[in-house]
C-alpha cells in the first residue's frame, strides 16, 4: 500500500524513541503489503480495530496507537497520528 503522511511516523519516532523500531516495522509491513479488506489486515495485525475506513493499530511493545484512514480500492493508507492510548 502507498503510505501517505509518513512524516507523522517520523515525528512519532522522535517523540517516542523507545518505539522507534516498532513504528518502523509497522511502516515496512504496511508499505510492502497489498491489503484488500479489513480481513486481510486482521490476518497480519490481529489486534487492530477498524470501522469503515478508520483503523487503529497498536504499536508492539508500547502503549501507542497508529490512527489511520485506509482506502482499499486505491491501496492508500493515510497516517492520521500516532498517539498514546488503547483501543
Identify the residue ranges that each predicted region occupies:
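Basic, Lys/Arg-enriched alpha-helical interface segments
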Residues: 1-63, 71-78, 82-87
Amino acid at each position: 500500500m502507498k503510505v501517505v503522511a509518513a512524516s507523522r511516523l517520523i515525528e512519532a519516532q522522535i517523540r517516542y524513541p523507545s518505539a522507534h523500531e516498532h513504528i518502523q516495522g509497522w511502516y515496512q509491513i504496511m508499505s510492502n503489503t497489498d491489503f484488500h479488506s479489513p480481513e486481510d489486515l486482521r490476518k497480519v495485525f490481529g489486534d487492530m480495530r477498524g470501522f469503515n475506513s478508520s483503523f487503529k493499530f497498536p504499536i508492539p511493545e508500547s502503549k501507542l496507537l497508529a490512527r489511520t484512514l485506509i482506502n482499499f480500492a486505491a491501496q492508500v493508507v493515510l497516517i492520521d497520528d500516532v498517539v498514546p492510548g488503547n483501543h
